[in-house]
Amino acid sequence: MEPGKEKEVEAPGELNQKPRPSTRSSTTNRQPKMKRRKKDLEELKKEVVMDDHKLTLDELSAKYSVDLTKGLSILEAQDILFQNGPNVLTPPPTTPEWVKFCRQLFGGFSLLLWTGACLCFLAYGIHVNYYKENANKDNLYLGIVLSAVVIITGCFSYYQEAKSSKIMESFKNMVPQQALVIRDGEKMQINVRDVVLGDLVEVKGGDQIPADIRVISAQGCKVDNSSLTGESEPQSRCPDCTHENPLETRNIIFFSTNCVEGTARGIVIATGDYTVMGRIASLTSGLQMGKTPIATEIEHFIHLITAVAVFLGVSFFWLSIILGYTWLDAVIFLIGIIVANVPEGLLATVTVCLTLTAKRMARKNCLVKNLEAVETLGSTSTICSDKTGTLTQNRMTVAHLWFDKTVYEADTSEEQTTGKTFPKSSDTWFYLARIAGLCNRADFKPHQESVPIAKRATTGDASESALLKFIEQSYNPVSEMRQKNPKVAEIPFNSTNKYQMSIHLLEDNSEAHVLLMKGAPERIFDFCSSFLLNGQEYPMDEEMKMDFQNAYIELGGLGERVLGFCFLNLPSNFSKGFQFNTDELNFPMENLCFAGLISMIDPPRTAVPDAVSKCRSAGIKVIMVTGDHPITAKAIAKSVGIISEGNDTAEDIAARLNIPISQVNNKSVKAIVVHGSELKDMESQQLDDILKSYKEIVFARTSPQQKLIIVEGCQRLGAIVAVTGDGVNDSPALKKADIGIAMGITGSDVSKQAADMILLDDNFASIVTGVEEGRLIFDNLKKSIAYTLTSNIPEITPFLLFIILSIPLPLGTITILCIDLGTDMVPAISLAYESPESDIMKRLPRNPKTDNLVNNRLIGMAYGQIGMIQALAGFFTYFVILAENGFKPLDLLGIRLYWDDTQLNDLEDSYGQQWTYEQRKVVEFTCQTAFFISIVIVQWADLIICKTRRNSLFKQGMKNKILIFGLLEETVLAAFLSYVPGMDVSLRMYPLKINWWFCALPYSVLIFVYDEIRKLIIRRRPGGWLEKETYY
């Protein structure tokens, strides 16, 4: 290097890694920063562009100014580290805890309650200023209680969210990482953060890859790319460029993936945020999440309730002015009516209902990180599911065998209980099992004797482990077989030879050897001049070649990984003690005898086909999005029902009819498999057309950026999208989705952090349970809100008549609080435990634009019908008690000014009796207590009718024990508040005569009968006028 000349350290294209610019002291304009951030995000959404995999070794050496044997010098490495910074990922921006707490305290529904509290304090302030020492403190108490409700509920919600975050923290496994680099010709172990661009790095089996590396030499190297690309099989690595796409070529190994076996040496071409994994992490943390459907619904509800409150408040403000009240009284009335419209207990009810459902879902293996995600899952209309580990078992398993010219099916179920079998008595099976068990480098880890064979941990790659377990279950213990047939020589599998060979001593003749081989079927078949049939050896013929070709195509077409097996009994001159040379090959490698084929696949989970079928019944579109090969993806999609029977792709139809694909009638095609390379060049409109035109879709060989584009496409079409995934490659899509679902067992930390929900058992079927719970809580929240809002009318109307008719106040502020935060709370929450009215998984997902949590019909039913009957019940009781005490209803009109006059102690009733101020107030508070009890009694009927929206109560039954407890609780609480000594002082509640409890009972019966008749008409005339106007 020339003195003073900077070393060239740039990687091309999208992964360009430039030296860090010096920090400027001047303040940069914020607007360009925001634009730049948005532009950076758009850049990150594009495909990875690099050409390092295409360069020759000399070009690579020149580009990074590195010696391919000695590596960088220590000084050069320090210089590059200073320019580019450490090899770490920039941590995503985290939300401070105080901001999270404030969101819970001031977001959504809390804002409405805070507004109500502020108005209460304002009204109290006006009262104090106007009336001095005689000011009514009800508004002060109401303001304090509202503030307390918001703070307590906010703390509860924050605690729930923080608890989920702590569970998330427990998933992390922070292990300091080391890397082996060669600098100045010497090997040295350094911290991964100190690895720099151009470093010569060596990796071996068990290592985590420290950066994006271009391989320059490899010996049997295989890497596990499943977290990055979704491929469940380990991928072999070599120095040669095998594909234009840098993610698919075999001469690049990626940061954060694992080397499972072999060794490799290579040059670092990207570090930190510039690696493929770094780009994904940056893309994930840069994405903005939209509002959850339930947050939108609560916002809609706030707008609705605020509009009603303001309309009533303003209307009665002007009415008060017209009736001759002072503007000060009119303002206090205005505030009072607005506050009376605020359902104080509803925030706590909704929070508790969501929390109960979240706990119920956790018991069913769905851990919800955000309470609002509980309902989002119920609204889902499209599920974009990863394949590996979610739909499949995430373990390679033997699926089929072909020997004696017959294909046999193996047991691929998770518990190995289907009882599928094959002729184990065949002598050919003896040879095939022996080859699969002996020519195999996998082994069981120690101390697992009590663990079922299928679930034992192994060393070795996925395919060899699958063969090991299969032979252990179906034949003999492999360890015994290996002891009796010790291995004396071996050629490991590599991507050039495409076979593995081993030589063993024969157990029945300790002087003779047998050569065993397995590998790519066509390669193995080429070595053979004979084949086994029913244990007898026959010379190879054209019929056998045709049978082999058909079997290979059949098994390969199922998306399975097929291996061929053959053997050769070595002549007697290769006796015990012979030194086999696997480099010079001093032994025969031709004229082998072909034994058969064994194919493997990562099989579907047992419960998935049923779960996909339930999704289809529920109107949910399930799309497979995977990084795996199209043939494998399509095979799994067909086996789990994502591509259903009879719905063929254009390629299937063309093959069946033996016509070109161009001649296939597009109208008859319902399913499609889209390759990532096609998606790469697609315009948004073309993607939208595919999503709209095809019912059953599989996206294969997709990159992380493409997964994100697919999610955005579904959202553009108005879908509520759930995305499942476990790898780093899934995290951008998980973050962008309406609800991201990560895998708890196999999921990466990055995917868990990006998701809203974690499947603790990694099972797709658990999602369907979650959808059912989400739909149920939406239905039950509607019922709970309808129940809670209904009592608003009997709470508001006393205040309105107090203004209009100038009668003594029928219901006090403190009494309203006793209803909203006392008697109504447990019954409202009990509706969260209500079972579904019908099979909620048989109906279409709700339309977020039209099917709102609180709609005009619900408000109409709660306020305009049931609420009005409840108000009548309350006023009936109120007038009965006043009449019994001497005040006839007509004589009460306009009496308020005299009634509330503290100086007037001789007010006459309808019969000429005189009443002092204190006596009048005792009667007034007794009436308010009776009005309160009347609301409780009519709320019995309201709670029972809210159990169903369509079904008759006689069909639904009273199986909800929590609801029965709620009925008892509100009754006991009402009696407690009425009869316990001291309540007359603290809450102005007075004991009632027993017969006053029965005044509201006819109205309670009326509510029940009226609603049963309404539901009967709705059931008899579906879609009729009554359903359109009253079914909420």
UniProtKB/Swiss-Prot annotation:
Q: Where is the composition biased (Basic and acidic residues)?
A: 1-10
User: InterPro entries from the entry?
Assistant: ATPase_P-typ_cation-transptr_C, ATPase_P-typ_cation-transptr_N, ATPase_P-typ_cyto_dom_N, ATPase_P-typ_P_site, ATPase_P-typ_TM_dom_sf, ATPase_P-typ_transduc_dom_A_sf, Cation_transp_ATPase_P-type, HAD-like_sf
**GO-annotated cellular components:** rod photoreceptor outer segment; sodium:potassium-exchanging ATPase complex; sperm midpiece
List GO molecular-function terms, semicolon-separated: ATP binding; ATP hydrolysis activity; metal ion binding; P-type sodium:potassium-exchanging transporter activity
- What Enzyme Commission number does this protein have? 7.2.2.13
Extracellular face: residue ranges? 118-141, 319-330, 802-811, 876-927, 980-994
List where Polar residues composition bias occurs: 19-31
Residue ranges of the region described as Interaction with phosphoinositide-3 kinase: 91-93
In which tissues has expression of this protein been reported? Expressed at high levels in the testis and at low levels in the epididymis.
Localisation per UniProt entry: Cell membrane
Domain of life (superkingdom): Eukaryota
Q: What does the entry list as the binding residues for Mg(2+)?
A: D726, D730
**What membrane topology is annotated for this entry?**
Multi-pass membrane protein
Q: Which reaction does it catalyse?
A: K(+)(out) + Na(+)(in) + ATP + H2O = K(+)(in) + Na(+)(out) + ADP + phosphate + H(+)
| GO biological process, any | establishment of localization in cell
Annotated stretches, region: Disordered: 1-42
A Pfam family it matches: E1-E2_ATPase
- How does its record describe regulation of its activity? Specifically inhibited by an endogenous cardiac glycoside, ouabain.
Give the keywords, sorted.
ATP-binding, Cell membrane, Ion transport, Magnesium, Membrane, Metal-binding, Nucleotide-binding, Phosphoprotein, Potassium, Potassium transport, Sodium, Sodium transport, Sodium/potassium transport, Translocase, Transmembrane, Transmembrane helix, Transport
Which PANTHER family does the entry mention?
SODIUM/POTASSIUM-TRANSPORTING ATPASE SUBUNIT ALPHA (PTHR43294), SODIUM_POTASSIUM-TRANSPORTING ATPASE SUBUNIT ALPHA-4 (PTHR43294:SF3)
| Role | This is the catalytic component of the active enzyme, which catalyzes the hydrolysis of ATP coupled with the exchange of sodium and potassium ions across the plasma membrane. This action creates the electrochemical gradient of sodium and potassium ions, providing the energy for active transport of various nutrients. Plays a role in sperm motility.
Q: Which family does the similarity line name?
A: Belongs to the cation transport ATPase (P-type) (TC 3.A.3) family. Type IIC subfamily.
NCBIfam families in UniProt:
ATPase-IIC_X-K (TIGR01106), ATPase_P-type (TIGR01494)
Quaternary state and interactors: The sodium/potassium-transporting ATPase is composed of a catalytic alpha subunit, an auxiliary non-catalytic beta subunit and an additional regulatory subunit.
This protein is called Sodium/potassium-transporting ATPase subunit alpha-4
Q: Which gene encodes it?
A: Atp1a4
